[in-house]
């Protein structure tokens, strides 16, 4: 795999944070954290959260730690490892059962990773999954429903102003599709 992806667009970050309905305290997992932007912003908004950020790509943990220092926040754990393997073993102290999960990674193992997350998700917990395709939605939504979670699907599209010779036009950005499950 290549270097960590760039920061998620601000419109996507805002939608994902809103979907997480961040509590004042609790445990947040950011799996497939990339640069850590969403988890670190959540920690900045809710400093009492315990954040576990996981990114498997080489250099990912160092980048997340550097971004955390820049934002003056302290994640509980930043790990450069495969999230599915991590969840199959022992997790760092106090982080074994999340209240909120942002599942941004998983690649071809995303279905197995979601199953592992659902086994550890606390009652009233929320999992939010950004999706690039409707096929991914068709694959993952039934897992949330079969586990008895309340499911929401959202799509948001933003437009940004682009200069024209005599004004500004609105250029559409790719839509942002999210799948959210809330455990009862």
Q: What is each PLM-predicted segment?
A:
Residues 32:
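Conserved S-adenosyl-L-methionine
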Residues 35-47:
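Conserved SAM-binding loop of SAM-dependent methyltransferases across substrates and taxa
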